[in-house]
């Protein structure tokens, strides 16, 4: 492991690879306990999470629903609830995957909020967008979508006295692959420190189908490039990112991309600048 790999892995609290099935189950139990502790410390009984159709939100939701199930069983209190939220922008091209995720999760409640009216209304009122190129406008509005989704989740959480769950994990964090104050905003991040293949392994341990576990990850924020794979945006694969974070050798080009992107996106992982 090179020094910079160790530095980044420590900064992101990267967890070691699962040695075996027992280690995986122990990690699942630890993260479920973490979720339960967050609710207890906040003196709240509701969790809210947006479901995209990808493996990250699927895995976080499976952990959340298990935590809620355990809390209900331990307390005999039916007030403990997990709310899964669908947040489409009009019609999502992979809606069938989102619905398949909901079937696997079996959430206590499912809410749907179409963010398109809010996103379009805001974009129509921002003069600066009228002068931008189509690609710039598409990128900026893509981030508006992510932030609107988080506003919707916090609105539900506020109405139901709940906490909002985030889906960030180490393989996304190192690349800064989240929208600042959008999907990067949450009250708790139960996947933090995991690499992508660990997220997939946890989903698989819950019995999630391989079609969802191995689905090609995509942020799907930009209209001009719908369904664009994350790896096309990164310039490296998740396999390379995972290897880097676990201190394994990676191709020099991939190494350089990961380090440069980590440094460039450092502001996303920190509190706002202050004097």
Curated annotation (Swiss-Prot):
Keywords in alphabetical order: ATP-binding, Ligase, Magnesium, Metal-binding, NAD, Nucleotide-binding
Pathways involved: Cofactor biosynthesis; NAD(+) biosynthesis; NAD(+) from deamido-NAD(+) (ammonia route): step 1/1
Any single Gene Ontology cellular-component annotation: cytoplasm
UniProt-annotated binding residues for deamido-NAD(+): 147, 180, 187, 267-268
Binding site for ATP: 50-57, 167, 196, 218
Superkingdom as given in the UniProt entry: Bacteria
Any GO BP: NAD biosynthetic process
Chain's role: Catalyzes the ATP-dependent amidation of deamido-NAD to form NAD. Uses ammonia as a nitrogen source.
Assembly and binders: Homodimer.
Family: Belongs to the NAD synthetase family.
Protein name: NH(3)-dependent NAD(+) synthetase
